[in-house]
C-alpha cells in the first residue's frame, strides 16, 4: 500500500470516528436507575412529621406519620409519635364523644408500641400518658380500671429510664389521684376489682420533685407540684410553685390547660 492509500484509509477512519462521536453527543444520557427508597422515604416522612409535632400541628404531623406507618408498621417510636398526635387532637376536640374517640385511637397505637418495644421507656410510657389523659372523660368504672395500667406504665418507663421526667410526672399524678379517691369510688372499685391501691400526696410530691430535678424547664411539673401542695393545705408552697409555672413559656401541648387549672387553684387559695 502506497502512502497515498494509507492517508486515504486513515482519513476514512477518522471521519467514521468523528461521526460516531457526533451521534453520541446527540443522544441524551440515560436516566440513572432509581435505587430503592423505602427506608429513605420513611426517614424523610418521620422528619417532616417531627417538624410539625414540635409546632403542635397534629393533623399535619399525622399525615406524614401515617404515611410512614404504611411502610414501617412495626416502628415502635413512630407509633408513639402517632399516639401523641391523637392525644393532641383530644385537647383541641370540642365534644366528649370526639375526645373519647381520639383517645381510643391513641390507646390502640400506644398498646402496639409497648408490645413492640418492651425495653423502650417512651413506648412503655405511652399507655400511661394516654390513659391518664382520658380520665377526665370516663366514668368511675373506667377510671378505676385505668389505675393499674397507668401505674404499671409509669413504673416500667422509670425502670427503663430513671431520668424520664414525664414518667415521674405521670406517677406523681397517679399518687395524687389515688390519694384523693373518696369512699364511694373506693368501695365501688373494691366491689368490682377486689381492692384499690392506697397512696399519699407526700408520694406525689416526691415524684414531682424528681421530675423538676430532671427537667426544670417544663411548667407542668411546677404547677402540678403546686396543686398537690394545695391539696395538702400548704398554701404558701402552692402559690410559689404555681406562680412560677405560670410565668414559664409553654413547652407542651397541654400547658395552656395546665396553666388554667393552676389559675383556678390559685383562686381557691385566696
Where are these regions (language model features)?
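Short coil/linker segments at helix-helix boundaries
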Residues: 48, 52-60, 84-119, 126-163, ...
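Bacterial N-terminal signal peptides
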Residues: 11-21
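N-terminal leader/linker segments that initiate helical-solenoid repeat arrays
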Residues: 23-66, 70, 76-90
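Bacterial N-terminal signal peptides that target proteins for export
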Residues: 2-13
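Terminal, low-structured helical/coil segments at or just beyond the last alpha-helical repeat
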Residues: 26-39, 184-192, 198, 215, ...
Amino acid at each position: 500500500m502506497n502512502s497515498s492509500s494509507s492517508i486515504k484509509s486513515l482519513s476514512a477512519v477518522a471521519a467514521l470516528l468523528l461521526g460516531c462521536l457526533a451521534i453520541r453527543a446527540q443522544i441524551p444520557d440515560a436516566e440513572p436507575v432509581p435505587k430503592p427508597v423505602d427506608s429513605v422515604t420513611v426517614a424523610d416522612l418521620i422528619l417532616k412529621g417531627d417538624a410539625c409535632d414540635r409546632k403542635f400541628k397534629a393533623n399535619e404531623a399525622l399525615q406524614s406519620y401515617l404515611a410512614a406507618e404504611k411502610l414501617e408498621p412495626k416502628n415502635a417510636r413512630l407509633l408513639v409519635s402517632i399516639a401523641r398526635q391523637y392525644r393532641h387532637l383530644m385537647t383541641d376536640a370540642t365534644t366528649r364523644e370526639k375526645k373519647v374517640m381520639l383517645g381510643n385511637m391513641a390507646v390502640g397505637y400506644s398498646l402496639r408500641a409497648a408490645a413492640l418495644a418492651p425495653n423502650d421507656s417512651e413506648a412503655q410510657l405511652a399507655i400511661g400518658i394516654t390513659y391518664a389523659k382520658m380520665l377526665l372523660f370516663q366514668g368511675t368504672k373506667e377510671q378505676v380500671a385505668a389505675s393499674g395500667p397507668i401505674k404499671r406504665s409509669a413504673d416500667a418507663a422509670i425502670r427503663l429510664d430513671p431520668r424520664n421526667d414525664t414518667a415521674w410526672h405521670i406517677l406523681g399524678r397517679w399518687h395524687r389521684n389515688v390519694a384523693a379517691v373518696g369512699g364511694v369510688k373506693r368501695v365501688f372499685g373494691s366491689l368490682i376489682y377486689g381492692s384499690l391501691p392506697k397512696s399519699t400526696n407526700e408520694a406525689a410530691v416526691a415524684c414531682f420533685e424528681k421530675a423538676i430535678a430532671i427537667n426544670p424547664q417544663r411548667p407542668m411539673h411546677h404547677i402540678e407540684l403546686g396543686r398537690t401542695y394545695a391539696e395538702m393545705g400548704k398554701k404558701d408552697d402552692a402559690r410559689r410553685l404555681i406562680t412560677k409555672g405560670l410565668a414559664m413559656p409553654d413547652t407542651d401541648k397541654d400547658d395552656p390547660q395546665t396553666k388554667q387549672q393552676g389559675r383556678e387553684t390559685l383562686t381557691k387559695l385566696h
